[in-house]
Amino acid sequence: MATPHLYHRYNSKSSNKNINSSGNSTEVDRFIPKSVSRNAYKSIPMLNGFDISYSELCEKSPSPERLSSPEFFNELRNTGHYESISTTNEFSMSSISSSSESQVTRSGSARASRNDYSKLTKEQKDHRKNIAHSLGFQLPDRVFTFETTSAEILEKNKAIKNCFGPGSCAEIRSTFDFSTLSPDVARYYIANSNARSASPQRQIQRPAKRVKSHIPYRVLDAPCLRNDFYSNLISWSRTTNNVLVGLGCSVYIWSEKEGAVSILDHQYLSEKRDLVTCVSFCPYNTYFIVGTKFGRILLYDQKEFFHSSNTNEKEPVFVFQTESFKGICCLEWFKPGEICKFYVGEENGNVSLFEIKSLHFPIKNWSKRQKLEDENLIGLKLHSTYQAQAQQVCGISLNEHANLLAVGGNDNSCSLWDISDLDKPIKKFVLPHKAAVKAIAFCPWSKSLLATGGGSKDRCIKFWHTSTGTLLDEICTSGQVTSLIWSLRHKQIVATFGFGDTKNPVLITLYSYPKLSKLLEVRSPNPLRVLSAVISPSSMAICVATNDETIRFYELWNDKEEIINEIQESGIYGSNIIEYMEGIETTHNKRIR
């Protein structure tokens, strides 16, 4: 037998004739499959309600050689379940099942099959049933029906099809009796129902509790962004929603309306052989600070660049030079008060407190207008300085009440200071790590909870009770912890990572607290490194600086949840004694001895 033609889709309005190589017209057989194989045999459209008692199945299974032989297709025509469609036949169920000659042949064959089937033992019947199920004769998605099916089969097929409909598959699986089916068919139905229940359409209908995104919603180019773990070169303004970026010797502000605006020209610091190491917006006004490698602190006002008519003068409002000439690594602002204050951490381990104050220069013979302008001048005043770490200060953080200061250093520790008296700070605890500590964050909704993260030789996030210095919990990560940010709306914390797994690098991980389970991971196909990160003014997104000279924005939360002021519930500190000290009532009545 020659190799069969590929099957064609039936069209009652077009001719089914085909011209062979000799020029003669031949009838196209629609039901001959594409290839002679077991898969082709299984894909043949069979009866929707095929009953194995009417089939001419052999008591012994056919050999693989028979399935792959051309004679198999000749014998398939005589089984009574296969009929070619000629050009004279109309495509209807009545015409297919009403060919008189083939009808008699199939009827006689079916009656003989019934008589033979009634003589079979139970084991032989089960064997035939399993063979029919394995070949797919009773799958519910048949295309053609050549003979009338019984009511019992129709009810069973209806129940199975309902499982794949819009209803709940879990409810149908609980009510449908799969013991009446063979193991292969039961597995088929369950697998398809599970796939249906886990389809994207059903997942879209489920309301999401938070926005999960594995890709940034905005990426900004940042050429000359220094790949430095100890620098903090991005800041996000809470008052103007602008982003401040330090690029080498230059500083830029990016806004959605104006785009990138140059703040500090490259020439200003390059002539002094200096560069930018730290930038920070004041959280409650328009001031911002730029720190440099040689201890310069530059004070700017955003109004001078966006609300002033003279935008060509890009000079800082005030410049302060430290006596140590050491680099400014990090900066932390106090809460709003009568005086605008902030701490800076330096390369020599010092922590200095600065104030922004008005400057008055009463000079004679000045006009009234000039005198009023000079009275509005502002400047920086050094309040106090003390040695906080033995080596370079890497990170710094203030608690909510501004009476505790956490300082992370390159000496593999974080020191906790009581600054109730700003003139006489007292060291309370030294919190150890195995590498430099840059990532430090006080919890905004649990006042005595502090999180710290270690460098590349530590790679651990630790949680401390600040009143006692107790280590509450810790979790090991896959990379160098470069920043920690608490969520203001959820009991969650975000960690960003630097050096870590080069084959499968993780940039960001969102953890729940206190369970510390991973809720979201942002991975990168390339070995990227996050240098630092800041939270958005809306507390829904974070902005990260990476070593590929880009600034990336990730949305992690939504604004449906309200900002949490304070949480006083059991489990936050993981200790009954500490929770008792914090005034948290436990759900169980246990005596503390």
Curated annotation (Swiss-Prot):
Transmembrane segments: none annotated. A motif (C-box) lies at residues 29-35. GO terms for biological process: anaphase-promoting complex-dependent catabolic process; ascospore formation; ascospore wall assembly; cell division; meiosis I; meiotic cell cycle; meiotic chromosome segregation; meiotic DNA integrity checkpoint signaling. Keywords: Cell cycle, Cell division, Meiosis, Repeat, WD repeat. WD repeats lie at residues 226-264, 271-310, 323-364, 388-427, 432-474, 525-564. Residues 12-25, 94-109 have a biased composition (Low complexity). Residues 113-125 have a biased composition (Basic and acidic residues). InterPro entries: Cdc20/Fizzy, WD40/YVTN_repeat-like_dom_sf, WD40_CDC20-Fz, WD40_repeat_dom_sf, WD40_rpt. SMART domains: WD40. Residues 1-11 have a biased composition (Basic residues). Residues 1-26, 94-125 are annotated as: Disordered. GO terms for molecular function: anaphase-promoting complex binding; ubiquitin ligase activator activity. One of its GO terms (cellular component) is anaphase-promoting complex. The C-box is required for the association with the APC/C complex. Interacts with CDC16. Activator protein that regulates the ubiquitin ligase activity and substrate specificity of the anaphase promoting complex/cyclosome (APC/C). Required for the ubiquitination and subsequent degradation of the B-type cyclin CLB1 by the APC/C complex during meiosis. Required for meiosis I, late meiotic gene expression and spore wall assembly. Belongs to the WD repeat CDC20/Fizzy family. This is Meiosis-specific APC/C activator protein AMA1. The gene is AMA1.
